[in-house]
Design a protein with these regions (language model features):
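ATP-dependent carboxylate-amine ligase catalytic core
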Residues: 2-15, 19, 25-114, 118, ...
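A glycine-rich helix N-cap at a beta->alpha junction
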Residues: 147-149
Length: 149
């Protein structure tokens, strides 16, 4: 059985997703939890950092490039872990443009498929109340997605 999980995402690249991901991986690992890291999308640099922080290999979950059988086989790497954490790529809804609210292969699509709550990382430098409007906009854009914070 797959463990519960989280998706770390953001409105865009460069907002601190990797920093938050690495901090969570190391903190949970130091608490004695066996954490399975994943990267949503085709990134091959961040998974090496994930492995260093979690002491477990990180795997890519790319619903655009991988068929369902391969995605399921990769997800099976989390069997036996206490928790799975995936780091999104680009922005939460960014993927191959399709008709509808989210792009094909987006982190939102992966989070929904895995039933993982989303932690939205915001770079709020130079903002105050506007940061709340951004977070609210993301939550209302796709109300079926479970936002954890």
């Amino acid at each position: 059985m797959l463990p519960k999980g989280l998706m770390i995402s953001a409105p865009s690249s460069g907002t601190g997703k990797t920093t938050v991901m690495l901090g969570l991986l190391r903190a949970f690992s130091n608490m004695g939890l066996n954490v399975q890291p994943f990267k949503s999308g085709p990134d091959y640099i961040d998974p090496a950092f994930h492995e260093a922080a979690s002491r477990r290999p990180s795997f890519n979950l790319d619903s655009w490039a991988m068929d369902e059988a391969l995605l399921n086989a990769i997800c099976a790497q989390a069997v036996g872990a206490d928790l799975a954490i995936a780091e999104g790529s680009m922005g939460l809804f960014d993927g191959v443009a399709t008709k509808g609210a989210t792009g094909f292969g987006s982190s939102a699509e992966t989070a929904e498929r895995m039933d993982w709550p989303i932690i939205l990382v915001l770079d709020i430098s130079g903002q105050a109340q506007s940061a709340a409007a951004t977070a609210l906009g993301f939550a209302k854009y796709a109300p079926k997605l479970p936002f954890a914070g």
